Curated annotation (Swiss-Prot):
Protein's recorded name: ATP-dependent RNA helicase HAS1
Biased composition (Basic and acidic residues): 1-31
Species this protein is from: Yarrowia lipolytica (strain CLIB 122 / E 150)
Ranges spanned by the short sequence motif Q motif, renumbered to the chain: 131-159
GO annotations of cellular component type: nuclear envelope; nucleolus; preribosome, large subunit precursor; small-subunit processome
PROSITE patterns xrefs: DEAD_ATP_HELICASE, HELICASE_ATP_BIND_1, HELICASE_CTER, Q_MOTIF
Length: 605
């Protein structure tokens, strides 16, 4: 039988270099002409300043020269999203077609649920009755700060963590996101600095290490409020900040320092006036995330440099073998192991209603568009897998008068910070982002989490949905899956994640596909952005390590292209493997027309 028109198009789109990488494979070079971005009708790219309460972060929003911008993340470590540069290769493990591949994948995402052999184990009942902070011995200064911040009672994690930390114990904490662990480690740290009467000339007494800049900023904000009635000094050093200004402040003396790993190691090795010989406590927050994004070696170097006689606190939402290894070299023997989740039925928050929807690739954007239109008064976070996909969908939605904010790792630090705090302070709105916002960030009153692109593994799923239903609040989550991705559900079931299947009748989904395709074909800026987003989506998809679930060779590329507004898949190149090996040329018709400029357009229904 002859091929149908659709099958011919799909066959053409799947013209790839077969087998392992051909060193002589021709890789399409990106155009030398800079891509122009569609400007949203109501731009949110330029926010003049943060709220007054965050103006005290010296140098963070300086508009002058920023030394060595993104120096800390020269290898892309600080964010988990895929690199979207054509010339950058992506390390991909070859899929093992033999037996046992499923087992290897499950082991790579397995969570260790047993405590270290020498640890004293304390199980925490998440439904325990809350006790007031006044029941533990805290200074009047700290109690006043807690009152000013609106905190009167402790979460179960805080109740079990603060007393042993005040007593000087090393702690390994396994707590769900949203459990109140930031206060749990900051309160004892600040109390210790007060008790020892730290002054600027004494240098740094406490270091808090965070995986991402946004989480570091959030910890800094909480610490600043807690220290409002104390005399000790506070500082922050993160990638994207002005390094010279950071060093000047370190030279003056920072008693409590919040940081990201790469920038901390830089200052430890190169800032001569940085006094850390009096360090009394090291706090490693979101340790699993720090290791996942490639900072294992940096953390080992940091621990080698810092004084050995210190108290250490390590917190991690999931306990993996690498986290255990880090705990072994950073904690004293016989630490206190605090586990909130081990006996819980669910790995996610109790107030979270979560589900999934099965949707073909060509209907994904239509469903997202319809969902956002129907929930215009809600506060929603949409997770995507790559920077360029976030960029495209952000531009597209703003262009068609559906206002959204976007956040990803390719943005300058000032833009990321402004967007982050703008969304925090918003009562409603949509944030489209990569996993840069998936860990630890306390964004209030989020109604919905939409996982538009599926997460890499159950841990990523748990951290994404952890942005809603925080504390005692409620929230909802929905994950988009194609029929070929349903195998991911068994991984979630094994991780004790309860999901319901949602159904959306076709009549409730706005049929704007033809208008979308006309817009993308006629607008050069959106067409270029859509092509970049399409390529980035495929490259991110190829990078998934659950190869039996996410199989790029089984993607219907015609349908995938339609979700980016293309009638025919555009010609793109994705690099799979090291040094350009395994480059795949995914071909299609490059059908953009350079006409149409920035402006606003509405889809009619």
């Amino acid at each position: 039988m002859g091929l149908t028109k659709k099958e011919k198009v799909e066959k053409k789109a799947r013209s790839v270099v077969k087998g392992k990488a051909d060193k002589k494979a021709k890789v399409e070079k990106p155009s030398s002409k800079p891509a122009k971005s569609a400007k949203p009708s109501k731009s949110k790219d330029e926010v003049d300043e943060l709220d007054d309460e965050f103006d005290e972060v010296e140098g963070l929003l300086e508009k002058g020269d920023v030394e060595e911008e993104d120096e800390e993340e020269t290898n892309g470590n600080e964010d988990s999203e895929m690199s979207d540069d054509d010339e950058k290769d992506v390390e991909i493990e070859e899929e093992d077609d033999g037996e046992g591949s499923d087992l290897e994948e499950e082991e790579s995402t397995a969570v260790v649920t047993t405590a270290p052999a020498d640890a004293e184990v304390v199980h925490i009942a998440s439904d325990a009755e809350r006790k007031p902070f006044s029941t533990i011995p805290l200074s009047e200064n700290t109690m006043q700060s807690l009152k000013d911040m609106g905190f009167e009672t402790m979460t179960p994690v805080q109740e079990k963590t603060i007393p042993p930390l005040l007593a000087g114990r090393d702690v390994l904490g396994a707590a769900k996101t949203g459990s109140g662990k930031t206060l749990a480690f900051l309160i004892p740290a600040i109390e210790m600095l007060r008790k020892l009467k730290f002054k600027p000339r004494n240098g740094t007494g406490v270091i808090v290490v965070s995986p991402t800049r946004e989480l570091a900023l959030q910890i800094y904000g909480v610490a600043r409020d807690l220290m409002a009635n104390h005399s000790q000094t506070l500082g922050i050093v993160i990638g994207g900040n002005n390094r010279r200004q950071e060093e000047e402040k370190l030279n003056k003396g920072v008693n409590l320092l919040v940081c990201t790993p790469g920038r901390l190691l830089d200052h430890l090795q190169n800032s001569q006036g940085f006094v850390f010989k009096n360090l009394k406590a090291l706090i490693i927050d979101e340790a699993d995330r720090i290791l996942e994004i490639g900072f294992e070696q940096e953390m080992k170097e940091i621990i080698k440099i810092l004084p050995k006689e210190r108290q250490s606190m390590l917190f991690s939402a999931t306990q993996t073998t690498k986290v255990e290894d880090l705990a072994r070299i950073s904690l004293k023997k016989g630490p206190l192991y605090l586990n909130v989740d081990e006996h819980n039925v669910s790995s996610t928050a109790e107030g979270l209603e979560q589900g999934y929807v099965v949707c073909d690739s060509d209907k994904r954007f239509l469903l997202l568009f319809s969902f956002l239109k129907r929930n215009a008064g809600k506060k929603i976070i949409v997770f995507l897998s790559s920077c360029n996909s976030v960029k495209f969908y952000g531009e597209l939605l703003n262009y068609i008068d559906l206002p959204v904010l976007d956040l990803h790792g390719k943005q300058k630090q000032q833009k990321r910070t402004n967007t982050f705090f703008e969304f925090i302070n918003a009562k409603q709105g949509v944030l489209i982002c990569t996993d840069v916002a998936a860990r630890g960030l306390d964004i209030p009153k989020v109604d919905w989490i939409i996982q538009f692109d599926p997460p890499d593994d159950p841990r990523d799923y748990i951290h994404r949905v952890g942005r809603t239903a925080r504390g005692s609040a409620s929230g909802k989550s929905i994950m988009f899956l194609t029929p070929s991705e349903l195998g991911f559900l068994r991984y979630l079931k094994a991780a004790k994640v309860p999901l319901n299947e949602y159904e959306f009748p076709n009549k409730k989904i706005a049929n704007v596909q033809s208008q979308l395709e006309k817009l993308i074909s006629s607008n050069y800026w959106l067409n270029t952005s859509a092509k970049d987003g399409y390529r980035a989506y495929l490259q991110a998809y190829a990078s998934h390590h659950l190869k039996t679930v996410y199989q790029i060779d089984k993607l219907d590329l015609v349908k995938v292209a339609k979700s980016f507004g293309f009638n025919v898949p555009p010609k793109v190149n994705i690099s799979i493997g090291a040094s350009g090996k395994g480059a795949k040329s995914i071909k299609g018709k490059d059908n953009h027309k350079k006409r149409g400029g920035p402006g606003g357009k509405k889809f009619t229904r």
